[in-house]
Amino acid sequence: LKVRPAGSFIQGPLPTGCALCEAGAKMVLFVTGVCHYKCFYCPISEEKRMSRDAWANERKLDWSDEKAALDAMVEEARSLNAKGTGITGGDPLYDPERTVRAIRHLKATFGPKHHVHLYTQIPFDIKWLAALQEAGLDELRFHPPDETWETPDSHPAYARLWLKAKEMEDAGLWDVGFEIPCIPGSQEQMSNLVGWLGAHKFRFINLNEMEFSETNYEAMLSRGYRIKDTETSRALDSEEVAREVMRRHAGGPTTIHFCSSPFKDRIQLKQRLSRQAERRAKPYEIATEDGTLVRGVIECPDPADMMAEIAAAFEVGAEMMEAAEGRVLIAPWLLEQFADEVPFPAYFSERYPTATELEVERIPLNEPAEDAPLPARRVPVVERELADLHKLGRPGQ
């Protein structure tokens, strides 16, 4: 058993897709929210659940204009210098045509080394295996419904599909693995599944620490599951189940990888945001160690006039400022020097380097005059909280 960062652990080699996710080098392509399984532990947000919309990380894609959607997808991948893409949902195979076209476009744009892995649960038409492989899919991850874990052979619609995909892996066409949540109390069923995978020499299985989210907590609590601690959304005893399954199958042919909830947030997501912050930072912004961007903001009725006054009075160059709707965006290290002389609200704004520019913290720098005119539109502040991380494109969700 090898201990990995943030409470994760593994026996066997780390899957390629996981290594790239750990480096923050994977874009998350959410193809569709459609899925008929209604798993009680599903953490998907209400906005995405059963929606036919697509997202590349936090960027919503309008697939009614496919070319524009594919162009936006590529732009998002470039925003983090992505070395690969994880395709998820819902279930991407509810829209296999869209999924195949997206894979082809990614490979055509970034080349064969752009690693693409895909999560799927449904027993889809076996013909799509060839289509996915020909499009360039590198890694196929099956997410079997929990009712199939105890006796996989009793569910031939699934088993046939999995074994056919394994034949293609044996022919050197791609990698095949599995991914399931560690449901407390399910160690017997999970162990049976891992034993079946080992008997057929499947490459790996990822065991995800089960988590509470805004959309699943009622269903989880009603089934008796409890939160492990007050600082995270982890389910009590989920990790212990993973350790027991690993103990039973130590030395087996199938890699068993436990991916903890803190790992997804503290390592995987943080690394991805840091890559985006580095590439998206404007001259007047500071990229932080947390993967956020900090800028100065002045709220005012006439940003162009405000910029002209600042340039004249404080000798601030044009590259250190930008006019926005009802605001001047400015280098925070410069704004700090003269914020007290500005008659309008001035503050530091910390935001995620994402398409939505989610603001996570605001630090006031002055006390503007009570009669200072304000812009008609005020920017809402969104406090930093774990629930928002589910909006930030975590692979596998």
Task: Annotate the PLM regions.
Residues 52-71, 93-137, 143-157, 180-192:
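Canonical radical SAM enzyme core domain
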Residues 1-9, 279-397:
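Radical SAM enzyme core and accessory elements
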Residues 2-8, 13-65:
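Canonical Radical SAM [4Fe-4S] cluster-binding loop centered on the CxxxCxxC motif
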